[in-house]
Amino acid sequence: MGKFLATLILFFQFCPLILGDYSPSCCTLTVGVSSYHSKPCNPAQPVCSWTLDLLALSADQALQPPCPNLVSYSSYHATYSLYLFPHWIKKPNRNGGGYYSASYSDPCSLKCPYLGCQSWTCPYTGAVSSPYWKFQQDVNFTQEVSHLNINLHFSKCGFSFSLLVDAPGYDPIWFLNTEPSQLPPTAPPLLSHSNLDHILEPSIPWKSKLLTLVQLTLQSTNYTCIVCIDRASLSTWHVLYSPNVSVPSPSSTPLLYPSLALPAPHLTLPFNWTHCFDPQIQAIVSSPCHNSLILPPFSLSPVPTLGSRSRRAVPVAVWLVSALAMGAGVAGRITGSMSLASGKSLLHEVDKDISQLTQAIVKNHKNLLKIAQYAAQNRRGLDLLFWEQGGLCKALQEQCCFLNITNSHVSILQERPPLENRVLTGWGLNWDLGLSQWAREALQTGITLVALLLLVILAGPCILRQLRHLPSRVRYPHYSLINPESSL
């Protein structure tokens, strides 16, 4: 038996190594400034899937475009089908006879060629059927109007791929990076019919930048402030920008109109600026000038200082209120005792009435039984008279009627205990002690007063101490928001 238990323990210790210890993980897809977590996937569950909104992807790519002056997906007047180009597969050169053609050089004449064209030939963008790798084993996708479903094998998580539009003359619009990661506690919200709301949950680099900025702000205030970050819509987001960096003229398409823009000419960040802010139109634009940083609204509040403790005498009002409370309790107890006494007498009278009603019902029941016996005798006599005609019922040509009188309800009524025994009065204790009614009530009142006195002696000091500290707790320090017009 001992050898069996030892073998079983060793098996459970090495079982995770044999079967594989796959912690919950996923594949994170990064587009521009936002990250999208796939459904749970690992080597044991190798399919990583996403459901993406093409308009949201365009907004992500526009905030941090890999190429200047790209035509966004939202600018199209019709829905075109897409091509998915994995970067771990080299495109075949079909020499102009198939899906991809090196002779079609118009898309490659752009200053920023198609993403991945450094190692590939340029893709063909004519009207063709399904792309070559739409149904590959490692990656496949389906497109439903403005929504995209991508399935990726976990072994290929860590590579990048491109999405292009099947329309001549349009630029590539999406460059997707993937990397393995752990599942977040809650998925970032993806709101439909909105271009930028999904970046309310920043990706991991954005969170680290925000924490670094908060750390820098606290250092500048000698850690005497509390930082509060508000979750709000993008219309209330703030922008921190450097007026020393010029914006190219004319500016590109406006992407975001913040509610507040703070210039920071003397602020040195531990990281680079991420976006381009145009002060003339008060908007984030698509130009790659990198002079601003988008932040959720946050406020600085002074840290409250602890006041000195002062010992005070207990106010007279506290003693007065305590005495009034004890007097009210004693008066209430006496009134309750008198009410209980009158209630007991009332129960006794009601019990007598119920007993008399029960006796009357029993007598009526006995009379009913005698009447039933008399009717049965008459029935038997009439049946003998009409014996030749088959009995009384056949002679009258009617259905025979019988009496069914039960004694169960009357017996239950007689067996019920007295009403005084069924209703709890006083404390619910059966203590007669050979005393009269008023003596028992006085004894209960005395025990109640002693219990209240012990409760006041035990809990009184604690209650008085809490009441003494109550005025100091009511006075809260005043918190003021950061001045929007002050320079950082």
Curated annotation (Swiss-Prot):
Placement of sequence motif CXXC: 225-228
Topological domains annotated Cytoplasmic: 464-488
Residues with attached carbohydrate: 140, 222, 244, 272, 404
Immunosuppression, as annotated region: 376-392
Motif CX6CC mapped to chain: 393-401
Ranges of the Extracellular topological domain: 21-442
Span of the signal peptide: 1-20
Record's protein name: Envelope glycoprotein gp62
The organism of origin for this protein: Human T-cell leukemia virus 1 (isolate Caribbea HS-35 subtype A) (HTLV-1)
